[in-house]
């Protein structure tokens, strides 16, 4: 919690979020930030849309996506980007409704802290 508070709610937030509430209870959220592409400039990256299980099926995910896309438009970015796991068929079907492009060309590369340290030690 401390890391989230520091990184998202300080003077220079690393991310922003949209919260969905139902009678004062958090029902879901989207978390996003700006990234920069050498080809496309400023892009809003949607890290997550999460809807708590008991609130699913009530268009909360739709509301969160639309609100996040409106934030992207307001920020004047050149587009949005996000990832979805290839096995997450419900999410894939959800995103298809919004005419997004599914890009099979890129392969994601990741390093956790341990891998990062090991890579730097090898130099």
Describe each model-derived feature in a short phrase.
Residues 82-91, 110-114:
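Conserved beta-strand-loop-alpha-helix junction that forms the acyl-donor binding cleft
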Residues 77, 96-105:
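Conserved acetyl-CoA-binding loop of GNAT-fold acetyltransferases
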Residues 51, 57-70, 93-97:
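Conserved acetyl-CoA-binding loop-helix of GNAT-fold acetyltransferases
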Residues 1-15:
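Active-site rim helix/loop that mediates acceptor-substrate recognition in acyltransferases
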Residues 19, 25-33, 50:
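Conserved beta-strand in the GNAT
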